[in-house]
């Protein structure tokens, strides 16, 4: 029940984010003297509408987005006689850019507001990858009976018997130097018998010997392959996890800005790798193991939202929504039509071109003919639609689940 509720709530949150994105365009367009004919949430048949002033507001039947119909976005649009002077393409460049940027800006504002709220209520995590193999705890070695399910074990584990304890930093195991906990775990899984281990405690290097215990773990034999039981080495240690940092009303402001900056860098890295993940998506659709690092659609995002609510992880719900808004804003600034960034690029191009022409004593050129750009726009749309269909299919047949 809570899982279904979470899906619905996250889908509604996405729709609200899209509606606010369009509100950004609407508000700035009206503020700069442009005419907005229609503002609608959803597509398809109209369920409800009302007119306020010169703008018609409404809700349509298919809740998969929204639109803001600004008069004269392009020079090829047909205008009424009283609309000509207020056409968007005739306005000053700064006004056009402001209107176009306002949509993505709303997504960024939503992201910042959510991060600020998380900082106050739950605290902010550290997004930076660990650079040392810090031991968080030691324990006995339990066999993984099923995926994510460990058996019982008692007594100290090999690491504890070798003298390791929480807070120690492992720098070398066997003949291999390690820099992160994941590096160390990968090395241990391949070893057996008694091996030397070097760790630091209070700045002092200590060498000991640890008995690698063979145990069962569910492992992937290759990228995207199914998890299968395998016998690997283990020493009974857990990673050190940094607790979220809590902030006050004022201290949360710079913390939010810093965290948003770090998150932007991480999101940028993820977006750049999307083309390399498409093969893994196709593999997942065919029945292979779904890589949790593969891109997802709003369907997959809603499923993740359902998982977070089902397990009471509201902080993850809001954080994921903040991240999604950051992604939506960034994608919309891509300088290609039909994205907002494509329209911004055209407005800036026209301004630079006309400045050069004016400097040469030549009359300004006509606005860019969008009809000539339609072939390129269609190419982008084909890729976008194909990407959406691919991710939606993967999310329906083999979704990413947080707790399975």
Curated annotation (Swiss-Prot):
<keyword id="KW-0479">Metal-binding</keyword>
<feature type="transmembrane region" description="Helical">
    <location>
        <begin position="314"/>
        <end position="334"/>
    </location>
</feature>
<dbReference type="InterPro" id="IPR008915">
    <property type="entry name" value="Peptidase_M50"/>
</dbReference>
<feature type="binding site">
    <location>
        <position position="25"/>
    </location>
    <ligand>
        <name>Zn(2+)</name>
    </ligand>
</feature>
<keyword id="KW-0862">Zinc</keyword>
<keyword id="KW-1003">Cell membrane</keyword>
<feature type="active site">
    <location>
        <position position="22"/>
    </location>
</feature>
<dbReference type="Pfam" id="PF17820">
    <property type="entry name" value="PDZ_6"/>
</dbReference>
<dbReference type="GO" id="GO:0046872">
    <property type="term" value="F:metal ion binding"/>
</dbReference>
<dbReference type="InterPro" id="IPR001478">
    <property type="entry name" value="PDZ"/>
</dbReference>
<dbReference type="GO" id="GO:0004222">
    <property type="term" value="F:metalloendopeptidase activity"/>
</dbReference>
<dbReference type="GO" id="GO:0006508">
    <property type="term" value="P:proteolysis"/>
</dbReference>
<dbReference type="Pfam" id="PF02163">
    <property type="entry name" value="Peptidase_M50"/>
</dbReference>
<dbReference type="InterPro" id="IPR036034">
    <property type="entry name" value="PDZ_sf"/>
</dbReference>
<keyword id="KW-0472">Membrane</keyword>
<feature type="transmembrane region" description="Helical">
    <location>
        <begin position="373"/>
        <end position="393"/>
    </location>
</feature>
<protein>
    <recommendedName>
        <fullName>Zinc metalloprotease Rip1</fullName>
        <ecNumber>3.4.24.-</ecNumber>
    </recommendedName>
</protein>
<keyword id="KW-0812">Transmembrane</keyword>
<feature type="transmembrane region" description="Helical">
    <location>
        <begin position="1"/>
        <end position="21"/>
    </location>
</feature>
<dbReference type="InterPro" id="IPR041489">
    <property type="entry name" value="PDZ_6"/>
</dbReference>
<dbReference type="GO" id="GO:0005886">
    <property type="term" value="C:plasma membrane"/>
</dbReference>
<keyword id="KW-0645">Protease</keyword>
<keyword id="KW-0378">Hydrolase</keyword>
<feature type="domain" description="PDZ">
    <location>
        <begin position="121"/>
        <end position="203"/>
    </location>
</feature>
<keyword id="KW-1133">Transmembrane helix</keyword>
<dbReference type="InterPro" id="IPR004387">
    <property type="entry name" value="Pept_M50_Zn"/>
</dbReference>
<comment type="similarity">
    <text>Belongs to the peptidase M50B family.</text>
</comment>
<comment type="function">
    <text>A probable intramembrane site-2 protease (S2P) that cleaves type-2 transmembrane proteins within their membrane-spanning domains. Regulated intramembrane proteolysis (RIP) occurs when an extracytoplasmic signal (possibly oxidative stress) triggers a concerted proteolytic cascade to transmit information and elicit cellular responses.</text>
</comment>
<feature type="binding site">
    <location>
        <position position="21"/>
    </location>
    <ligand>
        <name>Zn(2+)</name>
    </ligand>
</feature>
<feature type="transmembrane region" description="Helical">
    <location>
        <begin position="104"/>
        <end position="124"/>
    </location>
</feature>
<keyword id="KW-0482">Metalloprotease</keyword>
């Amino acid at each position: 029940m809570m899982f279904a509720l979470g899906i619905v709530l996250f889908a509604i949150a996405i729709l609200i984010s899209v509606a606010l994105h369009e509100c950004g365009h609407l508000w700035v367009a009206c503020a700069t003297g442009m005419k907005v004919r229609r503002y609608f949430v959803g597509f398809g048949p109209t369920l409800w509408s009302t007119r306020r002033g010169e703008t018609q507001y409404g809700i349509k039947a298919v809740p998969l987005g929204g639109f803001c119909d600004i008069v004269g976005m392009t020079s090829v649009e047909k205008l009424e006689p009283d609309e000509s002077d207020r056409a968007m393409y005739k306005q000053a460049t700064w006004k056009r850019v402001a209107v176009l940027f306002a949509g993505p800006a709303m997504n960024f504002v939503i992201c910042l507001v959510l991060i600020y709220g998380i900082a106050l209520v739950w605290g902010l995590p550290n997004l930076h990858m660990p650079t040392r193999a810090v031991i968080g705890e030691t324990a006995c070695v339990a066999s993984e009976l099923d995926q994510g399910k460990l058996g019982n074990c008692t007594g100290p584990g090999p690491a504890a018997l070798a003298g390791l304890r929480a807070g120690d930093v492992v720098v070398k195991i066997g003949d291999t130097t390690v820099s992160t906990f994941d590096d160390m775990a990968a090395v241990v899984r391949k070893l057996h018998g008694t091996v030397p281990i070097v760790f630091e405690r209070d700045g002092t290097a200590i060498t000991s010997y640890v008995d690698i215990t063979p145990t069962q773990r569910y492992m992937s034999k290759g990228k995207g392959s199914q998890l299968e039981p395998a016998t690997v080495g283990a020493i009974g240690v857990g990673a050190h996890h940094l607790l979220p940092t809590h902030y006050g009303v004022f201290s949360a402001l710079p913390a939010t800005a810093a965290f948003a900056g770090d998150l932007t860098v991480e999101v940028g890295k993820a977006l750049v790798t999307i083309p390399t993940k498409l093969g893994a998506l196709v593999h997942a659709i065919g029945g292979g193991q779904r890589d949790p690092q593969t891109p997802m659609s709003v369907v997959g995002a809603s499923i993740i939202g359902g998982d977070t609510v089902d397990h009471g992880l509201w902080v993850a719900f809001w954080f994921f929504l903040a991240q999604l808004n950051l992604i939506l804003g960034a994608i919309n600034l891509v300088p290609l039509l039909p994205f907002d960034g494509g329209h911004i690029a055209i407005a800036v191009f026209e301004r630079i071109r006309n400045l050069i022409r004016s400097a040469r004593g030549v009359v300004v050129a006509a606005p860019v003919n969008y009809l000539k750009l339609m072939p390129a726009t269609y190419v982008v749309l084909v890729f976008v639609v194909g990407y959406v269909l691919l991710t939606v299919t993967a999310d329906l047949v083999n979704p990413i689940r947080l707790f399975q």
